[in-house]
Amino acid sequence: MKTSMQRKLDQLSTRLAELNDLLSRENVTADLDQYRKLTREHAELGPVVEQYALWRQSRSDETAAQELLGDLSMRDFAEDEIRSARESMSRLETELQKMLLPKDPNDERNIFLEIRAGTGGDESALFAGDLLRMYLRFAERQRWQVEMMSESASDLGGYKEVIVRIAGQGAYSRLKFESGGHRVQRVPATETQGRIHTSACTVAVMPEADEIGEVEINPADLRIDTFRASGAGGQHINKTDSAVRVTHIPTGIVVECQDDRSQHKNKDRALKVLAARIKDKQYHEQHAKEAATRKSLIGSGDRSERIRTYNFPQGRMTDHRINLTLYRLEALMDGDLDELISALVSEHQAELLASLGDAD
């Protein structure tokens, strides 16, 4: 283990001991905000220090076994112990490296998931509906809460555009790698010749701002229009101007919400989505220079990048960023995404580890 890493772990061990002392004091709950901050830090450091203690125990076991090598009657036993201790240290060091990776500050946030139909007309809109169902089934498996924010249905079913809010522990950390272009290859229901068509949708995963005030929005920069909500085919579904369109003039970002009968609620939802879109835009602009110097295949979140192909005739899904192909498309479309997401997270961690190695 590198000296710098060991020094960092020693510091964390000392800090955990300090936290144990602070949390054992009688007046610890006098300041609830401070108490929550301390318990959160304790929960983060505990597993790291525990792993480090196991690594130190393995190192101690190796040292003890080294001392037995001079005894011929104990040599075989000592060599086995040394081998076992080194394997354990190597495994624990890898785990510790992952645990020490820089945390994405957005990882524990709720998200807005936006799906837009792209090339392919009605078939693309139908696929947008299939993608939405896939993500909703995955959210259901995680026991996350889902709220429809905005939808623009197509005439034959599916969506031209749909935005949902997904709330739950680690929502952004699990779904942030879904941003990008999703391509589908299949025979559409309307196809009489049995030909395979290719269509595409774009997915954007945006972390929710804790408060709208977290993103600076000058009311003077907003244009707010109201209009009658309409369903598929353009028919008006109520007689009041309850639908709201909010335009952020400096960025040109436009958000429409018409799902609720209350104009006030639609405006509130639109402002929340707008705040998330502005925050997302700022985040990508901030990381543009970094992406230019070190191309990250996984975490770029580039909307124009084709990240995945869903081939229905072959029953396969291919993620082009990590060259992973899974031949169980039906289960994946039903929200069984754990294997795919875990592979993306692991690859992203490997990229981060490699970049830290380059920095050393």
UniProtKB/Swiss-Prot annotation:
Keywords: Cytoplasm, Methylation, Protein biosynthesis
Cell location: Cytoplasm
PROSITE patterns: RF_PROK_I (PS00745)
Modified residues annotated as N5-methylglutamine in this record: 235
InterPro entries reported in the protein's UniProt record: PCRF, Pep_chain_release_fac_I, Pep_chain_release_fac_I_sf, Prokaryotic/Mito_RF, RF-1
One Pfam assignment: RF-1
SUPFAM superfamilies on file: Release factor (SSF75620)
Domain of life: Bacteria
One MF term in the entry's GO annotations: translation release factor activity, codon specific
Protein modification: Methylated by PrmC. Methylation increases the termination efficiency of RF1.
GO cellular component terms listed in the entry, alphabetical order: cytoplasm
SMART domains: PCRF
Similarity section: Belongs to the prokaryotic/mitochondrial release factor family.
PANTHER family xrefs: LD18447P (PTHR43804:SF7)
Described function: Peptide chain release factor 1 directs the termination of translation in response to the peptide chain termination codons UAG and UAA.
HAMAP family tied to this protein: Rel_fac_1
UniProt-recorded name of the protein: Peptide chain release factor 1
